[in-house]
């Protein structure tokens, strides 16, 4: 039943991602009943497939820590992407201590404890983080995109990721936090490269 559920949710995610560049990222979140995030009131997935949600809030000190990542102005789009990776990792650590996902392992490698997130949940949670950065004017060079999907490729399972667009060029990048365990920097590579089967371990 779990496999059927994952396949169904992946199919729905794929449907929602058709024409992803023309869709607001909130559309992906709305499928899981995740409302537009606020610093003091936001929701994230707390299980694979995003079947369970946690309603959380950042304290003033926590949000100050996140803002500090962007405190000095980014010098280039590439520099901002590096900061985004660090900020997403910082947010994952904070969220993990609040809802038990701190033991989330890399990929789908379960360890028999805590709460494991799959790529569907990771894409949603990272999109929540990115929308908060955008809402709070922390992003200078990028705009949050609709999550992206890649299908069966080179013997690999379907996969989802959050995404961003570079404002001046329109270049499209992943912000993929699924490959590594909770609190590690996300993968940020061109979407075309990611769709071709990118894996950081290759």
Predicted regions and their residues:
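Bacterial N-terminal signal peptides that target proteins for export
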Residues: 1-8
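C-terminal motif of bacterial Sec signal peptides marking the signal peptidase cleavage site
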Residues: 16-18
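Bacterial signal peptide processing site
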Residues: 20-23
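Post-signal peptide N-terminal segment of mature Sec-exported envelope proteins
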Residues: 26-53
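Acidic/histidine-rich, surface-exposed loop or edge segments in extracytoplasmic proteins
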Residues: 46-78, 104-112
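Mid-length scaffold segments of soluble, non-membrane domains
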Residues: 79-142
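Hydrophobic/aromatic-rich core segments of domains that either
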Residues: 131-194
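Low-complexity, Gly/Ser/Thr/Pro-rich intrinsically disordered linker/tail segments
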Residues: 194-202
């Amino acid at each position: 039943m779990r496999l059927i559920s994952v396949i169904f949710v992946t199919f729905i995610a794929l449907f929602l991602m058709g024409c992803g560049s023309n869709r607001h990222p909130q559309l992906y979140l709305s499928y899981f009943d995740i409302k537009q995030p606020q610093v003091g009131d936001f929701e994230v997935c707390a299980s694979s497939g995003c079947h369970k949600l946690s309603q959380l809030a950042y304290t003033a000190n926590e949000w100050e820590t996140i803002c500090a990542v962007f405190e000095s102005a980014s010098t280039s789009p590439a520099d901002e992407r590096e900061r985004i990776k660090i900020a997403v990792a910082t947010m994952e650590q904070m969220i993990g201590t609040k809802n038990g996902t701190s033991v989330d392992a890399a990929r789908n490698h379960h360890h028999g404890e805590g709460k494991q997130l799959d790529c569907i949940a990771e894409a949603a949670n990272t999109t929540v983080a990115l929308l908060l950065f955008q809402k709070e004017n922390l992003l200078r060079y990028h705009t949050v995109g609709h999550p992206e999907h890649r299908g069966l490729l080179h013997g690999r399972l379907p996969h989802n990721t959050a995404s961003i667009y570079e404002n001046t060029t329109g270049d499209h990048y992943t912000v993929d936090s699924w490959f590594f365990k909770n609190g590690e920097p996300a993968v940020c590579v061109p979407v075309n490269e990611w769709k071709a089967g990118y894996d950081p371990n290759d």
